[in-house]
Amino acid sequence: MANDLFNSFMSGPDEQGRFGIFGGRFVSETLMPLILSLEEEYEKAKTDPSFWAEMDDLWTNYVGRPSPLYFAERLTEHLGGAKVYMKRDELNHTGAHKINNVLGQIILARRMGKTRIIAETGAGQHGVATATVCAKFGLKCVVYMGAHDVRRQAPNVFRMRLLGAEVIPVTSGRGTLKDAMNDALRDWVTNVRDTFYCIGTVAGPHPYPAMVRDFQSIIGKEAKEQMMKAEGRLPDTIIAAIGGGSNAMGLFYPFLDDTSVNIIGVEAGGKGVNEKMEHCASLTGGRPGVLHGNRTYLLQDDDGQILEGYSISAGLDYPGIGPEHSWLHEVGRAKYVSITDMEALEAFKLCCATEGIIPALEPSHALAHVMKLAPELPKDHIIIMNMCGRGDKDIFTVAKFLGFDMSDTEGRDAED
């Protein structure tokens, strides 16, 4: 918990970009000047009223913020315990939380004179958000996406291309988010003069984890204000799904010093957290190491080689986690649990049936933990879960798992 060294859980990172022993910047000599230049530009922007005025205008008039805080009445009644609220970031322009951060980074890129934006993407939501903002500002956009994810997230691939982005399928490794990030970093090293790397999560070398967190914390700031208006007090528990952890950090950060609020992050348990490593639960089943420029919890073998991991959710299919989450885990301010594919699918179906909301598979993991937790809590206990993305992109994946033949115009089950 907070001690004399940390008067606030919100004080990190330090000047070297570290949260305790986590974070930092482990990058090549070629990239270090870029990283330092980005940090300098962001530090200037943070205290520049014109920067935040532009952000606020775009958040309001382009993204559609604030997103609603919605009382899920029928879901609450079905679960029979705590009151469940959803922070509806799936209603943002582009359908997820990702655009909150992309706007900030691309405004920074323009201030730095960069004309080419590169990004990595897993579920495709960060890629779509990046392509969207690049189209708005007339910037060249290149998105690296694992070949496996290109296949399972076809709707988002088409959206990116419609928006003018070049989508590059990455075939190395297992063709997922980790591999896409590797190739994006290689591109950045090669094209340092005109290129800005727009990272989609709270990972990577400093200042990315803190910068992305700051842009995403609009989620938690709004939720806190909206909850005070709705209930006259803070929530008892806040819950969010975690891949790299940007939507979760965005919800959690404004509540870190409110120690009465329980904070729970939900990792992707895949087929179960066991020695087979068919999951992406880095905190539940991993250990500290270095990947993509920062020290954090990772899935790795006994020799320190990074493992591929697995999840039904492309956006959670990452073998690491943001360093601030690793620190919050170690100091005990947040609790981290895992949810399996099948539990997430059950939550997906329940949300559709009770609330008329089709969630993405990523927040379905958070919702699955709500389904476990809420019935055990009193009716005056208040939960906020972050509905960080909509499920349009996942209908083909879900249909396959549920045995529904999408190619059949009659809409029959596959076994019929």
Swiss-Prot record:
One of its GO terms (molecular function) is tryptophan synthase activity. The keyword Amino-acid biosynthesis applies. Its EC number is 4.2.1.20. The beta subunit is responsible for the synthesis of L-tryptophan from indole and L-serine. Tetramer of two alpha and two beta chains. HAMAP family: Trp_synth_beta. This is Tryptophan synthase beta chain. It comes from Ruegeria pomeroyi (strain ATCC 700808 / DSM 15171 / DSS-3).
